[in-house]
Amino acid sequence: MTTNSVLQKYGTQLLFADHATDFAAAPDTPAHSLIIGTPTDVEMDLSELANAAMWQSAKTATLADTGTAWPIEWVFGACMEGAATPTAGGTYDFYWNASPSATAGTGNSGGCSGLNATYTAGGLDQLLFIGSLVCVANVINISSNVGTVVLPHLYGSLVIDNNSGVAMVDTDADNIHFTMTPIIPDVQAAA
């Protein structure tokens, strides 16, 4: 009896960073990179993110690979850079605002605006929880697998709740970036 194997492959990543000011095509320190291939850029400037505050990204372009079909499961990675050393055990908590609309102010969950801006709506319970990056006592904290998220809509935005004990670096935020990598099943022909 022959059987097929189901492997996985990566689709095009989403790359959340301050593309407008500080972040070039890759982190300033190559060892901090979570980037695979050529990602789709999404603007998210955390230079004003204080401790115990929240921030949201701009809304993504369509997540569709072809037509209106899109990958369901995505792996989330984060590289954070504090203005000082965060409290060990502190967290950066990540949420997803799933939206059926490409328009920034339309169809958002939890009071999100769809704009790169502070998030003060207090609607985290209405967002999809992705996971938490638990800090160690380093200025830069990295995890390539903060969590996975199943995306129910073609559009959305990222929300960060900073509980690290420190503000984010406010200048030269050239290492701060987040990736969402689609995991796509790849059925292999029977051997």
Where are these regions (language model features)?
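N-terminal leader/pro-regions and domain N-caps
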Residues: 1-49
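C-terminal interaction-tip segments
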Residues: 2-19, 161-191
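Extended, solvent-exposed segments with strong compositional bias
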Residues: 27-38, 118-149
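Short amphipathic, basic-aromatic surface patches that mediate peripheral association
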Residues: 56-61, 75-86
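Noncatalytic modules at the cell exterior or secretory-pathway interfaces
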Residues: 69-78, 149-170
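Short coil-to-beta strand junction motifs in C2/discoidin
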Residues: 86-94
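Predominantly extracellular/luminal cell-surface or secreted proteins
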Residues: 93-105, 161
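Acidic Ser/Thr/Pro-rich low-complexity disordered segments
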Residues: 101-126
